[in-house]
Swiss-Prot record:
GO terms for molecular function: ATP binding; ATP hydrolysis activity; ATPase-coupled phosphate ion transmembrane transporter activity. This is Phosphate import ATP-binding protein PstB 1. Coiled coil: none annotated. GO terms for cellular component: plasma membrane. It is an enzyme of class 7 (translocase).
Length: 273
């Protein structure tokens, strides 16, 4: 798969994810293992995720792809008995270092979950919620941020005349775009999407997929999906995870047309998984 270069206006070959420079890397995962109590969920994973592109994690149910995603903003910390070995570096800084402030990390690495989870507030208050937590009180600044975020999430034209209505009045697809707007309002560097369309209808799914293409012009996007066709459509690079191990990681076109590992080929062609 070739990646659009929004600056130059033409298509360029994808980066070689196995030979990224530090300048090209947003997230560096180094010998990462994760344990729930005594059970190992991830085993010695090392990979680099490039800046400003979409990386997909695929694999069978229970393979560890969502667990790996949640390591990138330490959401697994919320699960009792979790232990992590190895490092996850965001722009060169290990996010598991004791000095790291986790709330600040999660502002830098936003996350959107499988099912839309708007707050029981107005559309407007959902979008500016994180900004208010940061102490921003200026009405003009909040208004501008709300509009910019809703536009970026391809939702502004649908809700601009109903900003103060309850967010629960939106459709499922609209709610998911609202959640994306809420995530990007605080200007994260990375956006994590955990099966963001699995609960949506096909039309809403297409809208979200088109949005993902737009988002990568400003953010590094990492998506977990059980839908291989979706991974092929939206991602520049794909990692195949199986039984907590990284089996293969390359540009998406190579993964889907000429995988190097038999396990990857078997999964892609439906022989197991």
């Amino acid at each position: 798969m070739y990646s659009a270069n929004p600056t130059l206006g033409y298509y360029v070959p994808p980066l070689d994810v196995n030979n990224l420079t530090d300048q090209q890397t947003a997230i560096s995962i180094e010998h990462l293992s994760l344990y729930y109590q005594q059970s190992r969920a991830l085993s010695d994973i090392s990979m680099r995720i490039p800046k400003g592109q979409v990386t997909a994690f695929i694999g069978p149910s229970g393979c560890g792809k969502s667990t790996l995603l949640r390591c990138i903003n330490r959401m697994n910390d919320l699960v009792e008995g979790t232990r992590v070995e190895g490092e996850v570096k965001l722009h060169g800084k290990n996010i598991y270092h004791p000095d790291v402030d986790v709330p600040t990390l999660r502002r830098r690495v936003g996350m959107v979950f499988q099912r839309p989870n708007p707050f029981p507030k107005s559309i407007y208050e959902n979008v500016v919620y994180g900004l208010r937590l940061q102490g921003i009180k200026n009405s003009r600044a909040l208004d501008d941020a709300a509009e910019q975020s809703l536009r970026a999430a391809a939702l502004w034209d649908e809700v601009k005349h109903r900003l103060h209505e309850n967010a629960f009045g939106l459709s499922g697809g609209q709610q998911q775009r609202l959640v994306i707007a809420r995530a990007i309002a605080i200007e994260p560097e990375v956006l994590l999407l955990d099966e963001p369309t699995s609960a949506l209808d096909p039309i809403s799914t297409l809208t979200i997929e088109e949005l993902i293409h737009d988002l990568k012009t400003k953010y590094t996007v990492v998506i977990v999906t059980h839908n291989m066709q979706q991974a092929a459509r939206v991602s520049d690079h794909t990692a195949f995870i199986h039984m907590g191990k990284l089996i293969e990681y390359a540009d998406t076109d190579s993964i889907f047309t000429s995988p190097l590992k038999k396990q990857t080929e078997d999964y892609i062609t439906g022989r197991y998984g």
